[in-house]
């Protein structure tokens, strides 16, 4: 096979966008479809989402969240009930206006999100404080007709997500859940995807339309120097409950009632793209080992036409024994026993698909009761005993995960610049960093920062998008007595800025 067709032709450090597309397509995570911005999720990518689905479902069920499913269509009248909410999505809403040749009198939208679909039911189901809290979650797809450039996993017209919708009698309960869910999202990235994230609160300009406030986790993509919103947890306050008349009596026997406090929260398949962008290299995809569909591939080595039948059968039996050990211990293992391709071809085949560990087993390995273990992320090799090999492999999976997270964290931290002036701000931005800067918190100032930082990249003919607030990180250091980097007003908090997807 032509090496140029089999391997990557773009370099991560030279053409990041092309490199990324090659990683996820040649790595068989995703494929293109006839409609721009819609993608085919291949089994390798879908398995990662399945791991996230399984882990998160278990965690939220422990919090009392129940799974449900609501229709994907929303009447125009319902979608437009919350002004700020609909304005947030209006340019991206896809409308169904015809059925065959018949124009519909009442157009319906395909859900961009489900608040206005779900909350009419909440108003029917909630009457008493005994009906609270109500905690629902659905796994589904949404459609947002992106008008800007699309990028697989990161920004598409249709994508998969989960969306949680909850209602509480008190603000305290609501606020506690917002942060509890945000912590779970952070754990998805750290414990499954080996990706570090920053937890914080969105600015007023960047919060979800119709929310009291929005919290988010933000990741950093070193290859592009951009931040990316990794998940969000919103406090809706009583905004939607007032709109949809969702009320509950406040006490036993009381005739008074109050509007409930609501939250919504979600994570999407963007998470898969974030992990691929951060961990992959110029050889192809690098999958976090805990979510890889195949965690270990076994490649027999040294079998040729000159090998005796008895030796070959002995080696195959030895390899099968290793494979059974791993399978019985719950390791996801694949034996590549194809006879029509070389061992070298198999190495390349599995490297580009990101399989975390490779076991190379030949006649010498069998003679010493060993196998050669190769890590995908570092390409480091070592001989391991086949006695207790399942335990060895499981330890290596954890070590690899921890190493990947540590490397990504170190890289991210080295690219966070603390600045005190707009000149330092722009220098850091042009060096593809994200920035912690003292900021006044005023919306008009944020708009001006984005405008001022939109300029031609000095290293190309491309106009770089402006920086925006990514979040106001929780636990960031105080900025007492400092001035805003843009308007020179009194700064109220250090804020994370950056160009973003």
From Swiss-Prot:
Domain of life the protein comes from: Eukaryota
GO biological process: prolyl-tRNA aminoacylation
UniProt keyword annotations, A-Z: Aminoacyl-tRNA synthetase, ATP-binding, Ligase, Nucleotide-binding, Protein biosynthesis
Stretches of the chain forming a coiled coil according to its record: none
Enzyme class: ligase
Catalysed reactions listed for this entry: tRNA(Pro) + L-proline + ATP = L-prolyl-tRNA(Pro) + AMP + diphosphate
GO CC annotation, single: cytoplasm
Pfam families: HGTP_anticodon (PF03129), ProRS-C_1 (PF09180), tRNA-synt_2b (PF00587)
Disulfide bonds: none
GO molecular function: ATP binding; proline-tRNA ligase activity
Sequence similarity: Belongs to the class-II aminoacyl-tRNA synthetase family.
Name this polypeptide is given: Proline--tRNA ligase
